[in-house]
Amino acid sequence: MNFRNFFACLASVAFCIASASAQTPHKQMLSTNFGLPSPQPEETLPKSSVPVQMPERIAKVDARTVLRPMADNVWEITSGWEMCEADKVMTDDWYNATVPGTVLRTLVDQGVYPDPYYGLNNLSIPEDLCRKDWWYRCSFDLSEEMLAKESLELIFNGINYKADIWFNGQKLGSIAGAFIRGRFDITGLAAAENRLAVHIYPPANPGIPHEQSPRSGGGKNGGALCLDGPTFICSEGWDWMPGVRDRNIGIWQDVQLIATEGISFGDTQVITDLPLPEVNHADLTVRTSLRNSLDSDQAVVLEGKIGDITFTKEIMVPAGSQIPVVLCPQDLPQLKMQNPKLWMPNGYGDPNMYDLELSCVLGDKVSDTQVTRFGVRELSYELTVDAPSAKGLRIEHNPLADNHLGQLLDHRMLRDTLGGLHIPSLAEGLDVKDVTVIPNDGMSPYLIIKVNGVRIFCRGGNWGMDDMMKDVSREHLEPYFILHKEANFNMIRNWTGASTSENFYDLCDEYGMLVWNDFWISTEGFNLDPLDEDLFMRNATDVVRRFGHHPSIVMWCPRNEGYATETLERRLSAMIHKEDVTRRYHPNSRNCNMRWSGPWHYYKDAGVYYSYDAHGFNSEIGSPSVPTAASMRKMMPEADLWPISDTWHYHDLLNGLDEYVAAVDRLYGKAENLDDFCRKVQFINYDSYRAMFESWNSVMWADGSGVLLWMSHPAWPSVEWQTYSWDYETFGSYYGSRKACEPVHVQMNLDDHDVVVLNTTTSALEDMKVALTCYDLAGKKLSAKAVKDIDVPANSRLDLFKAELEGLKGNYMVRLVLSDRKGKVITVNDYMMRGEGTEDFKAFNSVENAKVRMRKVSATRYEITNVSGNIAMNLKFNLCNPATGEIILPAYFSDGYFHLLPGEKRTIEVHSPSTGAIMVEGYNVDNTTLKL
């Protein structure tokens, strides 16, 4: 088929559809943030000291599509795609396209526009990319064997925003929304040579991005694009990411071809029911569906395998229908699994996974196969509710056990308590007798999440979006998950659902990250609500069905910061009760059984986190987070690096954060250059991020059940709200978080100097010892105290004693050491302190440079020794190219930004997919490199 003739036939059709896709504003909209009504004045835009270096367009090459096998009967259509603007469809001006990928991804890959992550390059990319239609196309061949199959289908796992799908000159149908799959039958149209074309339509309300600068202020946090949810609403621009010029439209997920003998599987979920508190067996219920695309009823045999467990079931599937299939232990006793390996979140056990292998046998042929990964885990939630006969009732809600009651809670019937905290009511017709009442141990009214009967002290962070240009490949995302696991995090919040993808959930499963999963709406009363609730519900339903088998997902939440509209609240809660019997629908990311979110700014006195903020479950708390100088140099041109420039502001250094920047000069002395600023600010980053987590540690199970950073992960090169930088580099914020979140931990509360041991593991600690020692900057001991024979039960906190710091002068270090009965050090936690009458840490600058020596202990372990007579401060490690000194990323180190006393040794571990030399640097340490 000739593509030129094909597109000529579609010219008038494309115009009509584009016109029909227009939407009018909702007349009853109460929210106010429509974003900018027009582009901001030129004089308020950020300016760079150097012009943008525009790339050269890469010459197009002929590339034929090759179908990449994914399973026995599934192929991925990746290579050979082309893309062009809709008004150039009749020309030769096509690009080799990146699929999966967005429109902008292709244009950057092909050298049309510069890398938007660098400097102010994003401003040089035209805004009208999100106001144009685009076409994708590819050609592929099918073998006689594939053409002989009874059924051939195309699966689109994610487009944005809308798409028409054309195959061999015929329109197959349309897809609307960024998170719904499209499934199209091509059985009667497929030939030896095939042409596939996709017409991409942008959202009707793309909005106008606000460009951050010192003159324009911080981002406006969205705008008109929120009307078009389900989509990536943050791509209009937020205060942590600029507007993405194409709004992430395109074929952003993979396209697959599936061949069967006419009977195929739908989405599958394995429901695991444990006899809690016992976990010695699990009842497995398999929920799936079978679809018969043939014109006659078919008797099939469903065969299943889970490890050593096998089962079969004969099923009749009526012609042209899709039927639900439920397999349970009552009918198949082998689905009662003995001694299962449980899926547990990071720090509480291993995230064990099983594969359910299903085959559908039709006669002597296998029609379809499917592999579903699942974990044996059961969720429950402690929270406070109102019942008709009792207010403030503390209950444990197990969605699986309570499913027969219908929807347990009515989130439209809320009691407002002090501080804006809301208590939900039991649904109409339910009372105390219907629920599991538990004692109030001081945690009322706050939410507690339990996995397999174990309370989980939730610590982690928000992902505003996985990647600004939606590179959601496993290769790109997995290092971030390794960093989260090694930071001892156990929860990621999928903020406004912007990180929804198969790879995201797969990696959460594998690395033990609980997922708080939002849908695609933001702040109630500020951000706009979606115009098309039917479209929203179709996407939401598909997400719940598609990803419901992932054990990591712990809650569904309708929006960020607020409740859904009354109609969406009713529809979402009913849908989730029907489609997912294992999880809680949580109606609000704050307020309902939660504390108010925030703060998001730097605290001059980190003790305020303890005295004011630390209570309940907080879904967002954050502080600025400037990365290392090495990462900054990859982020912007040298001329914009110092002094702080417009480019810093464009990369999220917001107005109102002056105190964070000023704190560097105030506490550590005026920064002389970029390197000086970045090495000094890491003290602030470490202390701030450690304090946020340690403040919640101080009230674990007394008044606190969880805290999530805003944010743990950056969507692009940023100087704000992150624990690591986009390039996988770790710095003070990361290691401060990692220290505070270690499963066995000793800390000194900054508000009252109480010394506390935290044990978030499932095993008790016995005969432990805690030593507190104060040192001056030369490493001279000033005071000491030790406590022995300490027992700390599993999953608990123990307050020990108050550190006696009165009378200490100048700058000094408080060192806490937790060791076991044999004297083995479990953890060390150091605090740099200001004594009476001391306002800063400028004395650090007068400490003589320390010398350190490294030696290799094993393939992955290195010993570092302080061979000088004073403390070596803020030691940081990197893997580097021994010839050039260039930092190699990712590389994972067991510790960083710690201090060594004179003569002290410390062993670190490193692992990386690359090889190189180990380099150590420090605040008062000259760089030292150990070649491997």
Role assignments for model-derived ranges:
Residues 668-679:
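Short glycine/proline- and acidic residue-enriched helix-loop micro-motifs
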Residues 14-21, 625:
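Short hydrophobic alpha-helical membrane-anchoring segments
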Residues 345-348, 679, 683:
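Short, conserved micro-motifs enriched in small and acidic residues
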Residues 1-11, 20-467, 471-491, 700-704, ...:
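Secreted/periplasmic carbohydrate-active enzymes, especially glycoside hydrolases
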Residues 427, 434-435, 439, 491-655, ...:
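Substrate-binding/catalytic cleft of secreted carbohydrate-active enzymes
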Residues 226, 659-668:
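Active-site-adjacent bridging/hinge elements
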Residues 14-15, 630, 914:
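Alpha-helical transmembrane segments and their juxtamembrane interfaces
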